[in-house]
């Protein structure tokens, strides 16, 4: 039961649907956009009354797991005395992770935002560079990847297709299915796809992967986006065969397959062919 939310709502709907279909095939029923009205019962016999657009419903079960999220525990720290501003979601910081007290930094979950261990590690690296070496490092949330450890896994970095279309006038969306990969076929993990969004100049804006080892496969795209690489770079490396990582190279080639379908490009190719 998702109270007022949709399942995997922050992820690309195209990829999220792959995960949700797999979950449903295992017998899990998902109620989205629901409001919990009442919880009752005894140990081993629990009732949850919910309300959705379709009406009211009572769900019965033996156990109740509550995933209510978390928020920073800032009470009793004396932040006001230290001149450190904060709000309900966390301590306020600038792009350099400096608080309103310029001598104090804050990192990780206590500042809200993306609450991942690897984000806290990333923050720590920025603070060390700023505090010890006076390097003006700043947080770039656009290069932070995340992984949803479902089966199959889902991973993402950068802009989603929807976000990219909102920000840029023209984008190209590249896809490559896992079932075209020989390693995936050999180990019977063919479910999923790679999806990459590039701008009109070929700069990589975002990447999403759903499938076996998606969390490992996304790391190349995280590097590419952080270094502002273009999609052609992803074609110029050699991937060992047979590995799942070949999908990252194959999806990059879709950029030029798409270009070849353009009428003007086809005319140029035909003209060059006549020249021999």
Regions found by a protein language model. Name each.
Residues 9, 33, 39, 137-153:
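Flexible, acidic loop-helix segments that line cofactor/substrate-binding pockets
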Residues 41-46, 101, 187-192:
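A short, glycine/Asx- and small/polar-enriched loop/turn
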Residues 29-31, 105, 172-174:
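General small-molecule cofactor/ligand-binding pocket signal
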Residues 132, 137, 149-160, 165-276:
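Flexible, glycine-rich terminal cap/loop adjacent to redox cofactors
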Residues 1-95, 166:
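A Rossmann-like FAD-binding core segment of flavoenzymes
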Residues 51, 109-116, 147-154:
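Short beta-strand and adjoining strand-loop segment in the mid-core
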Residues 9, 73-76, 114, 182-184, ...:
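Glycine/Thr-rich phosphate-binding loops of Rossmann-like dinucleotide-binding domains
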Residues 58-133, 220, 235:
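FAD-site-proximal beta/loop scaffold in flavoenzymes
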């Amino acid at each position: 039961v998702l109270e007022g939310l949709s399942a995997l709502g922050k992820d690309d709907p195209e990829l999220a649907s792959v995960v949700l279909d797999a979950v449903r095939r295992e017998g899990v029923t998902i109620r989205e956009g629901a409001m919990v009205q009442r919880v009752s019962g005894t140990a081993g016999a629990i009732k949850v009354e919910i309300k959705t657009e379709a009406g009211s419903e009572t769900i019965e079960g033996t156990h109740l797991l509550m995933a209510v999220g978390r928020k920073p525990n800032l009470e009793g720290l004396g932040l006001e005395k230290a001149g450190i501003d904060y709000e309900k979601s966390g301590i306020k910081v600038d792009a350099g992770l400096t608080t309103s007290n310029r001598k104090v930094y804050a990192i990780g979950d206590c500042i809200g935002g993306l609450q991942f261990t690897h984000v806290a590690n990333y923050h720590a690296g920025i603070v060390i560079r700023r505090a010890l070496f006076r390097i003006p490092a700043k947080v770039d949330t656009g290069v932070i990847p995340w992984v949803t450890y479902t089966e199959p896994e889902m991973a993402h970095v950068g802009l989603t297709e929807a976000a990219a279309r909102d920000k840029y006038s023209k984008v190209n969306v590249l896809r490559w299915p896992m079932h075209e990969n020989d390693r995936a076929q050999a180990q019977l993990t063919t479910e999923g796809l790679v999806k990459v969004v590039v701008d009109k100049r070929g700069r990589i804006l975002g990447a999403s992967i759903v499938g076996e080892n998606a969390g490992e496969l996304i790391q190349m795209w995280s590097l590419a986006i952080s270094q502002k690489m273009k999609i052609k770079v992803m074609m110029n490396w050699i991937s060992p065969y047979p590995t799942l990582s070949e999908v990252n190279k194959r999806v990059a080639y879709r950029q030029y397959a798409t270009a070849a379908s353009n009428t003007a490009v086809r005319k140029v190719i035909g003209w060059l062919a006549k020249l021999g």
